[in-house]
Each structure stands twice: as structure tokens, then as C-alpha cells.
Amino acid sequence: MTTLRNVLGLFDGISCGQVALERAGIEIEGAYYSSEIDEYAITVTNRNYPDTVQLGDIKDRRDWDLKDVDLITAGSPCQGFSIAGKRLNFKDPRSTLFFDFVDTLNQYNPKYWLFENVRMRKDIEVAISTVLGREPVLINSGLVSAQNRERLYWTNIPITQPEDKGIVFNDIMIPNLPPTGELQEYFEEKE
């Protein structure tokens, strides 16, 4: 089993990074640090992983005094990069949070790191690749789930395309699920 001393999840959401590490059989002997500002996401993380050390806003990273960070994961806000959005790219202030990730990488110099984001315009992808010194791996979540979401992963960890599990929408549907208006009543009856 692989063991990491400390892990830092930036833009950590509901700490899916912790779920992934658990499923991969990777143990954290020290702390899992989370930088997240959404109160609902923090609540979910704290319920599922009560030992998570909440650091708050990445903009306060210079105040953090973390030691022996072996892994940094990040998936900065994607709205500015998304082809489905307005494509403001780095003109969207949320997109510039990518540079906070880069500064944090330089500050802690972890053994491993991973940055995830949406599929984007090629020139922006190239710009991010240039800054990180790595080309991304494009993975479509449709290979492992019942959704079609292409994501780019920049990392210094060797990764390969996952095997297609052949999961389709009907595989995840609850049989005989009532119409949406009755959904809450349905689940209340099951409790």
C-alpha cells in the first residue's frame, strides 16, 4: 500500500480527492488539508471526513504553514475555460485561480501533483501546458460512468486511459421511480 505524509486538495469541493485516494488504496499518514470556500461543500466534507483540516480560501495560502506535502490536487473553477460557457478564459477572475495553484505548487514543491479542468480552447490548453511543463491527458468520464464529460488532467503521475466499463444511463436508474413531483414523497416513504 502506498502511503503519503500529507495531502493538500485545492478547490477541494466535497473532497472527491479523498474518495479517490481511498479507492486507490493510498493511505494518508498525516493530514488531508482542504482549501475550499463553499460552505455546503465543506459541510459534506466534514460529515464524510471529519479529520479534514479546513484551510479556507486559497488566497490566504501564504498564511498556511504546511509541512511535508506529498500530493497537491486541484480543479480550479472551470466556467471561464469551458467551451460551453462564454469562453472568457483568463479574463474571467475565476480562471486566474489557476495561477494560485501554480504558486502553491512552487511554495510546497510536492512529490506528486494533479490539476484537472474541462476541455477548453486549444490555445488556452497550450498556455496551461507551458506553465505546468506537462501535456494533459484527455479522459472522458463516459468510460467509467453514465455521463459524457471530457476532462483534461495535467500531472506528474503516470496515468493511462481507464478501461471502458460500458456503463449507460439505464444502469444507474432506479426502477419504477415516480415522476419528479412525487420524488421527495417517495424517498420519505422509504425512510
Question: Language-model segments: what does each one mean?
Answer:
Residues 1-191:
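Conserved active-site and SAM-binding loop architecture
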